[in-house]
Amino acid sequence: MNHPIHDQGPQWVAGFMSGTSLDATDAALILTDGERVLEFGPVAERKYTARERQALQEATDAARAWNWTGAAPEDAFEAARKVITETHAEAFEMLRNGAGRGILGPLAGIHGQTVLHRRPRPGQVGATLQLIDAIALQKALGVTLAYDFRTADVAAGGQGAPLAPAYHGALLERAGDGASAVLNLGGVANITARMADGTLFAFDTGPANGPIDEWVEGHGKGTHDIGGAYAAAGRVHEGLLAQLMEHDWFRELPPKSLDRYDFNANMARGLSLEDGAATLTAFSARAVAAGVAQLPDMPERVIACGGGRHNPALMAALAEALPCPVLSAEEAGWRGDSIEAEAFAFLAARTVRGLPISWPTTTGVPAAMTGGRLRG
């Protein structure tokens, strides 16, 4: 059943994303009816303080140790929920300050903070956990909240990820582009291709920034490889890279999904800082190339969005590994840092209209699936 605010037609919807890189809450406004993207509005970024990032990391670590066994680490989860509420409310206020008269609508889509994701296995349904205090956040924002986008898909037997493909497809349709694939380079990489008949085909390809960030941070050199400098100064260990590419993951057929920590920095154990960064960067690129090879049709180009596109070493490795050109989102005329936030605004609009947000070809769910819960 449609939500009453759907009756207003296309509207300005706010979207929010806090990724597994734990660097910031991204927010964006788009004008949409859940099928088309009509206009792009203001964007905002609320970076996390060291204290906030620590709370989110502690919740993630506690979730991994718990892994749905025994009592949940509620103290750590509650501290993270408080961070999510406060930072999202501040990001929303930043959007409000940047929006013109009448550009802040009655709806917001919130992803929450993923702290644990278990993909389905034969005979075992998957599980996923995004931390959010929907009651507190809806009260803080004062608009209808769409959230919890993944659990219905997982409960129905789907992977629960990726979910951005619905929006990627709308961007490609808006541009009249049926020949490109969209590559999101977050902690994990995922790719979306839009077939000639409009069918979306999407899946996680493997790691992207996650292991690289973890490797650099583990050496006390910051939270990520700024400018790809460490990777550029290192040597790729081809023997290790070949071993990594033998992982069972690359023999699995899509759709498929990963937890951020399914591939981690331990893969480079024993290497120097620079060589480890170079090898992990090359691995992320080769994993993407292996994923592109699993698409039904080879795209004419790949459009990269997400934080990884800011890493010149990763973009160079992708250009070398892929058989087609790699463009940044900006080269395609998109706002690369805001696409995931925009995606959850788009999914919120689809949720209030009762439209699907995942399909058999994007998450492996048995049939086109609606998702998301509404509050307010």
PLM region spans:
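Short beta-strand-loop/turn "lid" adjacent to the catalytic site in phosphate-handling enzymes
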Residues: 67-131
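Short glycine-rich phosphate-binding loop at a beta-alpha junction
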Residues: 102-112, 297-308
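Glycine-rich phosphate-binding loop plus the immediately following alpha-helix
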Residues: 18, 24-30, 42-59, 140-173, ...
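A contiguous, well-structured pocket-lining segment that forms one wall/lid of small-molecule binding clefts
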Residues: 221-301, 312-320
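Glycine-rich phosphate-binding/hydrolytic loop that grips phosphoryl groups
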Residues: 22, 282, 330-376
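Extreme N-terminal starter segment of soluble prokaryotic enzymes
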Residues: 7-14
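Glycine-rich phosphate-binding loop and adjoining helix at the ATP-binding site
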Residues: 104-165
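Short glycine/proline- and acidic residue-enriched helix-loop micro-motifs
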Residues: 65-80, 222-228, 269-271
